Amino acid sequence: MFAKEYKIKAVPASRPKVPRYGHPYYPKRYTEFRKRWLEITKPDWPAIQAEMENTEEYEFSFEFWCAKHAKSDLDNVAKALEDELVKAGVILDDNLIVVTKARKHFNAGYDAIKIFIRRIK
């Protein structure tokens, strides 16, 4: 099982904005979170990949703590975390996730995300 806590503020996945003229783009807040999430998790990629090696099913669970009351949906935060690890090639395919557990803590006084990845089969 892989488990680690990261000191970063959780940002939910957002839909791309589509201007009348030009190309679709993601909001700056979400784009910056995606970059930062990959930066801080990069040293742990070998451990995550080792946990997922030769597996058909796994659990991806997380908890996040908010300094204030967050309005973000749990499923959108999970999507943001999973999608970036898939894009980086750390997680081969997020359709192998068969169990997801999520929990958020309000008014904790600090921002953090803790992820758990466990091989099932």
Show where each model-derived region lies.
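Acidic, proline/glycine-enriched N-terminal capping motif
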Residues: M1-K121
